[in-house]
């Protein structure tokens, strides 16, 4: 097994371990949001031997060996030997986990998520169940989970398949393929129900049960927003469908003309159709283009005609998305929120204010 690796550390403290052998394949795990990161991914296989340059870029040589128990599970489930790995040590947060790309030469076999956090293991089990349910509904272009379990030394392991190749593309603009995937979710998993019966409503209930996690002013504005949403839905039945909840370029790729979507660990069964598109648009604006809340709002204004083709009231839909994403992150991270998550929540709250003003105008 190859032991010679390159350790990559970015300015946010995120760490990747890349094998020097078949590095180009290993780098398929690395999904940078910045132009600098994308250039690094392109040229690293040819430049990593330049020691002075690597030092300036925050890289160093290390030796790395996969945990033998995890290695055994992977080889057994994928029915392969001499597999290779690249490793991402995770985004610093309450749900930090290690993600491993499994490959052999130029052939990517799948991915493995690892944690010692029992709460995260519950999320792994949810994702396995959710993927199985999506398959039963006829949703394709998603992974399968051949294994979700625990090693003897207490590591929780989640395996998933992939169709990714070296020719796969990551599209950073919301396009027809992304909308077609969301349309498929609506058609194949859509169901009529009362708002108060939906997963979407349960997320709001979870926030209300943890209202102490918000400042007084934030709590007041969230209460106003949830009242607006309650009034919008009323007592009639509405169509809800499956929701990815982290629908971003980093959780999908295109290959052979098809879009493949993964990382459904926060997936839910009953949300407003197409709501995922707001997460794609908002998060790429924040992370890739570093736009302010006002700039993101102006971009949404420019998309209003397009959004009206998918939503009866696009501004209400955007408010629903913003309230939901704030609620999920506040409840998920609790009192352990990092400064980066606090910054995100502040941006979403500012956007929520702008959207609520827009709704009053209309």
Residue ranges and their predicted role:
Residues 97-102, 231-275:
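Active-site acidic catalytic loop and adjacent metal/ATP-binding pocket
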Residues 144-154:
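Short beta-strand micro-motifs within the conserved protein kinase catalytic domain, predominantly
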Residues 275-309, 322-337:
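Active-site activation/catalytic loop segments of kinase-like enzymes and analogous catalytic loops
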Residues 328-362:
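ATP/Mg2+ or Mg2+-diphosphate-binding catalytic cores
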